[in-house]
Amino acid sequence: MFSRSSSTRSSLVGSRSGSIFGGGSVKKSSTVRGFSAGLERSRGLPSASAGENQISLPGLRIPVKASSQPGNYYLKERGIDLPIVQQQKFLAADGKEMGECYLLDTSRTDLLDAAKAALNESNLLEFNKFKEFKKYKGKNNEFSLVEASVFDKLIRKDDSPIHLNRLLIAVLPAVGKGTPGTARIKIRDARLDDGYGELFSSENRVDSGYIYCINVGYSVPKSEIDYKINIDFAGVPIKDGKSPIWVKAAFSLAGGPPVFLDGTMSLGAEILPDSHKELLGTSALLLNEANSNRKSFSGDDGELRRDYPYKRFEEISPLDSISQVDTASQDSVNEVNTENVQNGTGEVYLAPPSHSVY
């Protein structure tokens, strides 16, 4: 259902088309710095000095401050080894760093390792229906995770820390193959002004399907949580008020002590066009095997279910809802064994979304 993209990866920093992570609301002239495939970008990015620390990763060298904790180290501490294939920094016009986003590359085996840890959790709030997004001239579509969910039933509004540690977004085209134009998805923390709240940005062709898995790098007080998903379109020949894409989301909010990670970590995958509708559930897009019935940790109306029974990984349906990375405890990582499912039918690959090179 997933396959590694044969397209050449590109991160044309500042370019509207063909970028995995864009600069958001900042201007494209020297306001964004990025690293990709071991190459230091030429747009406004000085070469790393000899005295600057270098983190060596597969296919990537990331200059970091001595106090920085790279995203792959954070994942390895939780028993998950997903190499970073792209790092994108968002900078304000004055050069101050706004945020950072990592694109992680993984294979079938890595995905199973990540999934088995998350199967022990039952706090994934899922919207089981796709939402249409209409195109309006001069207007962006935006919806709030809080207002669009049963947020008030999920947690009490207080000032204790809460962390958006999983946000899954599936995008499907509502137009035929070959339709020109692009759709851009942004995730932002609406508490912050002037583009500083942008956490994730991805732009791809409107006639292709994608799924994104996003882990925000910090906690906020429960009473202040205000994450928004923003959609806009470019070059799509569709009438105003009509819908070029479908979008479906699922997310998990984790309590406990505050979290502080160095950046927003993300996974991206292209959805192949021959997917049956039974395979397009948010969870099924992450882990799919043949001849399995889809179940969910959440109810049909998106309400949270806390009574989901524990099962060993070998016993559970691969189409059950799966969150992406266990940030609460590493103990569960070693509790299950995936040997019996490694040879299952079907193939699952997560890879950076395909995109054109301009």
From Swiss-Prot:
Tell me the Gene Ontology biological-process terms attached to this UniProt entry.
Answer: transport of virus in host, cell to cell
Alphabetically ordered keywords of this record: Transport, Viral movement protein
Reading the lineage from the top rank, the first entry is Viruses
Q: What does this protein do?
A: Transports viral genome to neighboring plant cells directly through plasmosdesmata, without any budding. The movement protein allows efficient cell to cell propagation, by bypassing the host cell wall barrier (Potential).
Q: What is this protein called?
A: Putative movement protein
